């Protein structure tokens, strides 16, 4: 559902914003946010009892007061190192909404069958590729595990970051066409390839990171570390804004 929304929103808002009027585009985005809030408010009846606080059992209290073992401390260090990888990953990945979109608007030939694709439409590519490749990627990693070739979570996250980096390398082809071949605009397929590699990198990193945290984080810090992961994601987005 999230990716369906992420796919359709840039098409609708992008069309009305770029083609019709920017004020209408922003209004449509605001309407979508209000609609989401309405669904949340009226859906509360389906969430009765979920997330309500309960008194901690004696066992839970004992667990929370127990000091971390050496193994748990080592795991926390590994998690911190993985957070560094994710800062770099999200800082690069979220360039899609910044300089990559400006690059698409100014430098890429977006005319297909006589129709110029609004640059904002390309923001749908990430979600489209996730919908298209999510199941095959999950099946691949399961097959990889059955073959006895299971890789560590750190390896997968590092690999995902490298693959995502290759997505930027694909833009070298676009730069070559413009700067060396002196074409007026770069071919669109370079950007399509770049986004494809970014999503393959994301599917190798993001789901793995969430699973990695739940497995490695000590029970007393599980919720904190999950929250820290999303804070790190936000820091990566901040880095993306500073760069692009």
Regions found by a protein language model. Give the residues of each.
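The feature captures the transmembrane alpha-helix scaffold of multi-pass secondary transporters
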Residues: 80-83, 120, 185-196
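Hydrophobic transmembrane alpha-helices of Major Facilitator Superfamily
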Residues: 91, 95, 200-207, 238
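Glycine-rich segments within core transmembrane alpha-helices of 12-TM secondary carriers
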Residues: 1-18, 24-40, 123-135, 161, ...
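Intracellular juxtamembrane helix-capping segments at the cytosolic ends
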Residues: 1, 199, 203-218
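Intracellular loop-helix junctions on the cytosolic face of multi-pass helical membrane proteins
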Residues: 13-118, 136-137, 141-147
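Cytoplasmic membrane-interface "Motif A"-like loop-to-helix N-cap segments
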Residues: 143-164, 185
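Loop-to-transmembrane helix entry/capping segments in MFS-fold secondary transporters
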Residues: 1, 23, 116, 188, ...
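Helix-loop junctions at membrane interfaces in 12-TM secondary transporters
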Residues: 170-193
